[in-house]
A protein has these predicted regions:
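C-terminal low-complexity, glycine/proline- and small-hydrophobic-enriched intrinsically disordered tails
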Residues: 1-192
C-alpha cells in the first residue's frame, strides 16, 4: 500500500509482509539503523480490510544507540491538506485511487502557511537524518580503524598503522563531538 502526492511521488509504503528478524552480530558502535517502532502492517485477509495512514511522511533517521531529543522528535511531518493518491498492489496488479486530505475546520491558518511549515519541517527532518547518518558513518569508520589497530599489533608496521589509526580515530571523534554531545546525560539534548 503506497501513498503518493498529487504528482505521483512516493510518500510512504506499507506492506503486509513481516520484516525479517534482526541479525545477531557485532554489538560494537558500528550498528546499522534500527527503526524505533514497527511500521503498521497492511491486513491481507480475504474480504474487506481497513488501514489508517497517520498522514505522516517518513521519520528522520536515528543514531544507535538512539539520540535523546528532549526538545524535538524524529517523527516525519504531517501531510498538508490537498490531493493525494493511494496505490494498492496485490499479486502484481496495482490499483490507484485519488483522495483528498482536508484541513481541520478549526484551523485558521492559510494553505500557504501550512505549506511553508511543512517545507520547513521536511528540511529539518532531512538535515537531522543527514546529521545522524554522518554520526553513524563516523562510528563505523572509527570501529574499522580500531580493528586495523588490533590487526596490526605484532606486525612489522604495527606502530605506524596504530599511529595512523589513532590519528584517524581522534579526527573522527572531534567531528562527532561537533555534531552531537557524546557525553550528554539522559536529561540533556545531545544535538549541537
Amino acid at each position: 500500500l503506497t501513498f503518493l502526492d498529487a504528482d505521483g511521488n512516493e510518500i510512504r509504503t506499507f506492506t503486509s509482509e513481516e520484516k525479517g528478524s534482526e541479525p545477531k552480530g557485532d554489538e560494537s558502535e558500528a550498528k546499522e539503523h534500527k527503526p524505533k517502532k514497527k511500521e503498521p502492517r497492511v491486513p491481507k485477509e480475504a474480504g474487506t480490510n481497513r488501514f489508517i495512514w497517520d498522514l505522516r511522511y517518513p521519520d528522520a533517521h536515528d543514531t544507535d544507540p538512539p539520540a535523546v531529543l528532549w526538545a524535538g522528535t524524529l517523527r516525519g511531518p504531517l501531510a498538508v491538506p490537498g490531493q493525494y493518491q493511494v496505490r494498492l498492489t496485490v499479486n502484481g496488479q496495482s490499483y490507484t485511487q485519488p483522495f483528498e486530505v482536508k484541513v481541520d475546520p478549526r484551523v485558521t491558518v492559510s494553505q500557504e502557511d501550512l505549506q511553508a511549515q511543512f517545507d520547513l519541517l521536511l528540511k529539518i527532518r532531512d538535515k537531522l537524518s543527514e546529521t545522524h547518518d554522518a554520526i553513524m558513518q563516523i562510528r563505523n569508520l572509527r570501529s574499522q580503524a580500531r580493528e586495523w589497530q588490533q590487526r596490526a599489533q605484532g606486525s612489522a608496521e604495527g606502530e605506524v598503522i596504530a599511529s595512523a589509526a589513532e590519528s584517524i580515530i581522534k579526527a573522527l571523534t572531534e567531528i562527532e563531538e561537533e555534531l552531537i554531545q557524546v557525553k550528554a546525560k539522559e536529561i540533556e539534548d545531545p544535538l549541537n
